[in-house]
Amino acid sequence: MKTEIQEIVTRLDQQSNKGEGGESMKWLFRPLLQMLAGGESVTIEDMATTTGKPVEEVKKVLQSLPSVEIDEQGRVVGLGLTLIPTPHHFTVDGKQLYAWCALDTLIFPALIGRSVNIESPCHSTGEPIRLNVEPDHIVSVEPSTAVVSIVTPDDMSSIRTAFCNEVHFFSSPNAAEDWLDQHPGGKVLSVEDAFELGRLMGTRYEESRPANGSCCDI
């Protein structure tokens, strides 16, 4: 299974580098998630300050992202982690946030460095699936038989359309059978294996550092 997970990571990384945001996501994504985890929309100026990038560069990257969610004031309200309700409830430090897909809920605790409670319906039966996830491990999963669907699309120019919209929780492998029949190239992973997949995928994103480069920037 470790080999299979690594193959999925390699495939998704290759497509992500050519897809939405490309290499820019490596410096933008993690700091943006950490700011969104505070439960408030994020300004371009705040992103520039946090990443140490010029405002115009941040603005240009955001304008190139077809999936990013921006409010009427031009502030970011969602990119993977979102303030806009989805089926994937993501509660961090008492704040109710949401994620675009099942795998996001498993990737983001490590990227934001927080313990998270997750609730999401089985895509087939509607049965609630509840998890408590720490940055480095899964504390609990109910039901224990839950699995996560995974796809590896060729075109990631819109990550939400191509990937996120097909990545769901199912209450059991049996509950995912119809989805697998409809997605011949798809797979289902145990929650533990999906967490490991997410951990490996998350390593492509840089740690945020102060804009003045004073910490560990030698």
Swiss-Prot record:
It catalyses: an alkylmercury + H(+) = an alkane + Hg(2+). Its EC number is 4.99.1.2. Gene3D superfamilies: 3.30.450.410. Keywords: Lyase, Mercuric resistance, Mercury, Transposable element. InterPro entries: MerB (IPR004927), MerB_HTH_dom (IPR024259), MerB_lyase_sf (IPR053717), WH_DNA-bd_sf (IPR036390). SUPFAM superfamilies: NosL/MerB-like, Winged helix' DNA-binding domain. It is an enzyme of class 4 (lyase). One of its GO terms (molecular function) is alkylmercury lyase activity. One of its GO terms (biological process) is response to mercury ion. It comes from the Bacteria. Belongs to the MerB family. Cleaves the carbon-mercury bond of organomercurials such as phenylmercuric acetate. One product is Hg(2+), which is subsequently detoxified by the mercuric reductase. This is Alkylmercury lyase.
